[in-house]
Amino acid sequence: MRPIWSPIWSEGSRRVSLSRRSTVVSEVVPVISDPCRIHVIGVGGAGMSAIAEVLASMGHTVTGSDLKASAGLDRLSALGVDVTVGHDARNVAGADLVTRSTAVPDRNPEYMAAAESGVPVVSRAGILAAICAERDAIAVAGTHGKTTTTSMLALVLREAGLKPSFIIGGDVNEIGTGAAWDTGRLFVVEADESDGSFLLLPRRYGVVTNLEPDHLEHHGGFGELRNAFLRFVSETDGPVLVGVDDEGGRALAAEADTLSIGADPCSDWQIQNLEESWEGVRFSLRGPDGGTLPVELPQPGAHNARNAAVAAAVGVMAGADPEAVSQALARFGGVARRFEQRGRTAGVVFVDDYAHLPTEVAATIRAAGSGTWNRLVAVFQPHRYSRTQKLWRGFSGAFDGADILYVTDVYPAGERPRTGVSGRLIVDAVRDAHPDQDIRYVVRREELVVQLADELEAGDLCLTMGAGDLTSVPDEVRALLEAGDRG
């Protein structure tokens, strides 16, 4: 099939060059073109284990350590990475380079040993920047949809035969991993704006899915966050595609030199004729020359349509055959914790989602509402005290469409409690806006599981949402329901 558009991003684009010291933060970014010995402190987390996997695939000798055993360590060990449970200064012996998770403190014995012996130590962002410098990186940034969009794009490029490398914040179901190092020129990476380190990544191409207030505890305010994204756009070597279906994205695209994508007819890439159902979405994507690409996605929600549109546009611009793009998206099975169907027990369907910001929650509720359920029972766990303190009022209308809402206490994510900040803030916000809303505040996890098992009925959808540890609740509730059936 003849491509609908000629690629805007040419096959012969140059590789990104990178100075050894970033102009964004005062951190030396190593050059890792030649094989060396790299030790990873805190290798068990999803982000660092993905990096370790890629480093090993690049030909480096990789070792790593973490405080406790995990499935992630087992996977790395199977890939040939020498992993150790526990931190010990001896683990860094012989290392040419050390990198550490953001959760690893300066008092860590391995970090201290490396620093004292003169072995270079870089952050997660620093080692990720070094990896990006080895390929033409496509950095996917934005407030919402980064992981899903990055996953879709990796699948699209892979199915089109472009053999991309990638590091994603979750495992892609069709690929079975969230990290790979292949022989193609493209490297797809999820760019995290939470601490500003996304500006450290050298990138040939950029994506901003959308822009809303988040991570203000680091940036200080939305104006500062917006300025960081303006830098992200201006410091990207090649084209940047920006979603313009939200106010922040529209303002960014209007001020910066970008390509735009969205439902707006003035967008360079326009989403047309969107149809939604519980089974998924379908739409047409009009390109800059007026040609259209049909897209069907087996994931519900207008937000997923926007994610798919971005992946399709970037895929075509990167040289993927449009027909291969459509075929890849038509079989996209999702990412862990992104509207992930967790099974059916006693006639109740369970879905788990990572949504933790007001607009994400609202979009997930809307997507769930497209099904034919007797009731939509939503369960929400607020994430971080700092985020809850700043955003709790924004949740007042986020749960519209839920028949019953359970709210738990805040998942701290390493933060210390703050006076007056708890899940009750969100409960109060919802009750003030919707006095008739059936909302229940349950602090203790064990009580939540029991209450859900007692409340749920055949024909209900149980939707758990949050970025913390609520993800295991569906399994716990299902176990109780199954025990009840057997009894």
Language-model-detected regions and their locations in the chain:
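Conserved RecA-like helicase motor-core motifs
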Residues: T63-G64, L162-I168
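ATP-dependent carboxylate-amine ligase
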Residues: W5-V81, G94, V98, E116-V119, ...
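Hydrophobic anchor at the beta1->P-loop junction of P-loop NTPases
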Residues: V40, I138-V140
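Acidic, Mg2+-coordinating active-site environments of NTP-dependent enzymes
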Residues: L73-R75, N91-R100, P105-S123, L128-R135, ...
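Switch II (G3) loop of P-loop NTPases
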Residues: L186-S194, F350-A355
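Short secondary-structure boundary segments
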Residues: T102, I168-G169, V244, D409-V410, ...
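Conserved motor-coupling elements within RecA-like helicase/translocase cores
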Residues: W181-T183
